[in-house]
From Swiss-Prot:
Subunit structure comment from the entry: Part of the 50S ribosomal subunit.
GO cellular component: cytosolic large ribosomal subunit
Function comment: Binds directly to 23S rRNA. The L1 stalk is quite mobile in the ribosome, and is involved in E site tRNA release. Protein L1 is also a translational repressor protein, it controls the translation of the L11 operon by binding to its mRNA.
Classification via SUPFAM superfamilies: Ribosomal protein L1 (SSF56808)
Biological process according to GO: regulation of translation; translation
Molecular-function GO terms, alphabetical: rRNA binding; structural constituent of ribosome; tRNA binding
Alphabetical UniProt keywords: Repressor, Ribonucleoprotein, Ribosomal protein, RNA-binding, rRNA-binding, Translation regulation, tRNA-binding
Highest taxon of source: Bacteria
Protein name per its UniProtKB record: Large ribosomal subunit protein uL1
PANTHER family noted in UniProt: 54S RIBOSOMAL PROTEIN L1, MITOCHONDRIAL, LARGE RIBOSOMAL SUBUNIT PROTEIN UL1M
Family: Belongs to the universal ribosomal protein uL1 family.
Database matches in InterPro entries: Ribosom_uL1_bac-type, Ribosomal_uL1, Ribosomal_uL1-like, Ribosomal_uL1/biogenesis, Ribosomal_uL1_3-a/b-sand, Ribosomal_uL1_CS
Length: 233
């Protein structure tokens, strides 16, 4: 049997795996247990009452968190003409068409988000094998294929998170950093849950948001009592 590290022993002693924690208590616990030598992210896992094997029950989208994620996001935009100037003015680091595609083919991937105007998809489509596996392929459902590229750039910079359920029907994303205030983390989590509820598939039956857990990068998950969250029904 593998020997538990001192950190894991402390976590096991502090976190009750059978308990639903009030959101403020959960955040306080995460902060207490965050002892890594870097500022850890606060991640969330949301178990949804969907059948991920059915395409009409998959949940995918994006939402801007009110307090951002604490990450600096580099944005690449495929567009041209006036849209290119607007994207640059909005803060995009990389803007282009075929020239940008050639950079990516050459292995230059110094960006976190890719946005494209509809007329640029003929170029972006040829990069599917490169961008797809990295989760960077633009998609209308996440607002990254849009005629208004400037707004999409601003959203990405403001702390937009993209979400998509995995094969087990679970959404994984980040809601901030452990040095955020409890109010900031609570409001970010509430914004995410509200967005997920709005994205509920019409055919999904029964309890939709089944479980919500938050954790730090190096920590264990803490289950949240959803009654302590202020979210849309």
């Amino acid at each position: 049997m593998a020997k538990l590290t001192k950190r894991m022993r402390v976590i096991r002693e502090k976190v009750d795996g059978t308990k639903l924690y009030e959101i403020n208590d959960a955040v306080a616990l995460l902060k207490e247990l965050a002892t890594a030598k870097f500022v850890e992210s606060v991640d969330v896992a949301v178990n949804l009452g969907i059948d991920p094997r059915k395409s009409d029950q998959n949940v995918r989208g994006a939402t801007v968190l009110p307090h951002g994620t604490g990450r600096e996001v580099r944005v690449a935009v495929f567009t041209q003409g006036a849209n290119a100037e607007a994207a640059k003015a909005a803060g995009a680091e990389l803007v282009g068409m075929d020239d940008l595609a050639e950079q990516i083919k050459a292995g230059e991937m110094n960006f976190d988000v890719v946005i494209a105007s509809p007329d640029a998809m003929r170029v972006v489509g040829m990069l599917g094998q490169i961008l797809g596996p990295r989760g960077l392929m633009p998609n209308p459902k996440t607002g990254t294929v849009t005629p208004n590229v400037a707004e999409a750039v601003k959203n990405a910079k403001a702390g937009q998170v993209r979400y998509r359920n995995d094969k087990n029907g679970i959404i994984h994303t980040t809601i901030g950093k452990v040095d955020f205030t409890p109010v900031q983390l609570k409001e970010n989590l509430e914004a995410l849950i509200s967005a997920l509820k709005k994205a509920k598939p019409a055919v999904a039956k029964g309890v939709y948001v089944k479980k919500v857990s938050i954790s730090t990068t190096m920590g264990a998950g803490v289950a949240i009592d959803q009654a302590t969250l202020d979210t849309a029904n």
